């Protein structure tokens, strides 16, 4: 038996913040697990904006006790599925937890639609006609979420994780190091921002915020959902071209990342949604130099880790919101939204 590392459990810090007058489409989870409840399982969950809302899904949302978007529905459904599994007292491995939550969502969607196919969504005839050439476009109408799921084991002072999408795990150490063991997959945001930047010659007087709302950018947004659990025209998963999401489709199993992190010397470990990330500067977003992009990202994440270590999640969030508000036109920090939902579940060890 491995020796118990530390009798004192880590301190939990949690933020889950949405901009005023907007529904929070994130969710979070933090529960005890194991025979004595000595382990901690936590998750940061980000509902993905659904490109199209099928009538049966909208009718289901309208019957709920509170207004829900498809993204909020997906995030909360996944949270509740995870909680039920963890509540058994001896939950399975994190990868199994994640995949079973996705399967739960798939079963619920099949109960609504009859099948996870484009025809079953019963979209308006003109919309269906535009999409019918590619059955993979069913992804545009499926509610989806991404998440980072973590499990702290005090006996070994290690952290296991299972991950799908553009949420992330950030670990900071007392010696100044930090790591982000989760990879985001093929994100569409960079391509969307570059598309917006190309419009600057045609619309030089528009702030970048307005360029991101142009019809050309919105068209790319609509079809970017094709890359959720992406498969090629032959139905073969293409992990380097797609991004893992929990949308009920079984192809998710090819996109789940798992691993273990040694926490020796760690100050904190934090699962977070991308809205809690310090935004990338224009120099990082639009650079063509891979080494420069890597260096700027490392500097940005290092600064972020330092702010969280010093000020805590709430203090960091206050500074993040101030920086976003000071850039209302999205020129310093090119991004799709001024403020995104921001969620983090942090385990502080020192």
Predicted feature locations:
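Short Pro/Gly-enriched beta-strand edge/turn motifs at strand-loop
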Residues: 7-14, 127-134, 326-328
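Residue-level marker for buried hydrophobic side chains located in beta-strands
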Residues: 41-43, 163, 269-271
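C-terminal catalytic subdomain
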Residues: 57, 216-350
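Helix-loop-helix
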Residues: 63-117, 291-327
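Catalytic core of PPM/PP2C metal-dependent serine/threonine phosphatase domains
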Residues: 90-174, 205-261, 332-339, 343-347
């Amino acid at each position: 038996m491995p020796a118990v590392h530390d009798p004192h459990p880590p301190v939990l810090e949690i933020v889950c913040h949405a901009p005023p007058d907007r529904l929070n489409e994130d969710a979070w989870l933090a529960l005890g697990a194991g025979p004595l409840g000595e382990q901690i399982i936590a998750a940061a969950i980000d509902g993905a904006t659904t490109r199209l809302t099928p009538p049966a899904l909208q009718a289901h949302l309208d019957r709920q006790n509170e207004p829900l978007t498809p993204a909020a529905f997906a995030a909360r459904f996944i949270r509740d599925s995870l909680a039920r599994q963890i509540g058994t007292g001896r939950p399975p491995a994190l990868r199994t937890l994640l995949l079973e939550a996705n399967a739960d969502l798939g079963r619920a969607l099949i109960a609504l639609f009859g099948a996870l196919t484009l025809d079953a969504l019963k979209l308006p005839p003109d919309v269906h006609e535009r999409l019918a050439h590619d059955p993979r476009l069913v992804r545009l109408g499926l509610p989806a979420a991404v998440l980072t799921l973590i499990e702290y084991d005090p006996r070994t002072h290690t952290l296991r994780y299972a991950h799908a999408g553009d949420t992330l795990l950030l670990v900071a150490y007392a010696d100044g190091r930090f790591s982000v063991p989760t990879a985001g997959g093929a994100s569409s945001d960079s391509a969307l921002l570059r598309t917006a930047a190309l419009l600057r010659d045609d619309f030089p007087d528009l702030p970048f915020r307005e360029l991101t709302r142009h019809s050309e950018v919105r068209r790319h947004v609509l079809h970017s959902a094709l890359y959720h659990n992406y498969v090629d025209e032959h139905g073969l998963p293409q992990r380097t071209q797609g991004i893992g999401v929990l949308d009920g489709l079984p192809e998710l199993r090819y996109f789940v990342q798992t691993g273990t992190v040694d926490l020796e010397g760690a100050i904190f470990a934090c699962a977070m949604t991308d809205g809690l990330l310090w935004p990338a500067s224009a120099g990082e977003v639009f650079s063509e130099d891979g080494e420069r992009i890597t260096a700027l990202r490392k500097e940005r994440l290092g600064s972020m880790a330092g702010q969280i270590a010093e000020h805590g999640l709430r203090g960091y969030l206050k500074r993040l919101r101030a920086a976003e508000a000071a850039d209302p036109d999205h020129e310093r920090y090119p991004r799709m939204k001024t403020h995104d939902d921001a969620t983090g579940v942090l385990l502080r060890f020192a």
